[in-house]
């Protein structure tokens, strides 16, 4: 994360360090190094060791995110199965994660390499807009996917009323809303002349606010829109989902107990007839709860990855005792950079909960296909040999003794299982 310091004073200036509200838009290695070491008379220097660490982390995140999400999209494209609503949401969440990689991580990686933003004013505004757009898209796509799981579990009859159309409308709304909410970046960020250590002036892509409290308002709004509000919605949806599943399972259990005791009555709770909202507990457990678990893991990963970043952002603008050199701590810097690790985790979560996606992904590559075929052939040969050996050992002709004279043995031989 970048916390440019230098001559910036929140009490005396309305210009803000490049607050992108994206973990990658941060070079915590900037001006403070020159202030601490005084090795460069121009003052526009940075902590090179920390900068190298940032560049390495961003490069790894970019490569892993691109490979993982591209593999998921390729597997979804090649899968012979009929595309479900969950696959539709996974596809668009992978696209949102690719947007994070290309619009957020990659520009910041280039920015860290060049130290200062190298480009015209319009490019500065576009980059800042796309960085925040990717953040909104990733968060809101997760919200609509969780909302779809809530509808599927708590209101199953609604899934019969044009479910594909509703899902596409929800996805389109999340993309459009993300684009609109990130549009103010065009008016907040621009190429301006900033003063660094020792009075040196340079051009960089920074945010400018009319009022001194603008930075606090901006960071608080972005934290609420990208993190707090989505987390509240996600928590509410999962609260209803868990309550509904618990009530359904309890009703089914009470119904089975009543049937076992010979009572032909449905269970009552507080004078009301308790009837399960879904036809079968097994159906919930195997189909819907698996996708609910997958979405829950994705939500948990999102919170764990992004919470440290937003905590540091809020701390830096609301704590009057905060100094920019605090962000020179490598642990703070890397913790903030790891926010985009969420885009790397999601593909593996999809593949873990949808085993066929991993198989379809592997089959997309010829080299992996040959390896799978070789292992499958070896396993098939080994299984055939084991089956033949097992059958021969169980055959009466290979047995000793008077098995024909023993009716008990003769009857038992008929029921000896032979694996197929």
UniProtKB/Swiss-Prot annotation:
Residues 32-45 have a biased composition (Basic and acidic residues). It is found in: Cell membrane. Residues 76-92, 147-168, 247-294, 353-420 are cytoplasmic. One of its GO terms (biological process) is regulation of systemic arterial blood pressure by vasopressin. It is a multi-pass membrane protein. The keyword Methyltransferase does not apply. GO terms for cellular component: plasma membrane. InterPro entries: GPCR_Rhodpsn, GPCR_Rhodpsn_7TM, V1R_C, Vasoprsn_rcpt, Vprs_V1A_rcpt. Residues 1-45, 379-411 are annotated as: Disordered. Residues 1-54, 114-125, 190-225, 316-331 are extracellular. Its main location: membrane. Keywords: Cell membrane, Disulfide bond, G-protein coupled receptor, Glycoprotein, Lipoprotein, Membrane, Palmitate, Phosphoprotein, Receptor, Transducer, Transmembrane, Transmembrane helix. The chain crosses the membrane at residues 55-75, 93-113, 126-146, 169-189, 226-246, 295-315, 332-352. This is Vasopressin V1a receptor. The lineage of its organism: Eukaryota, Metazoa, Chordata, Craniata, Vertebrata.
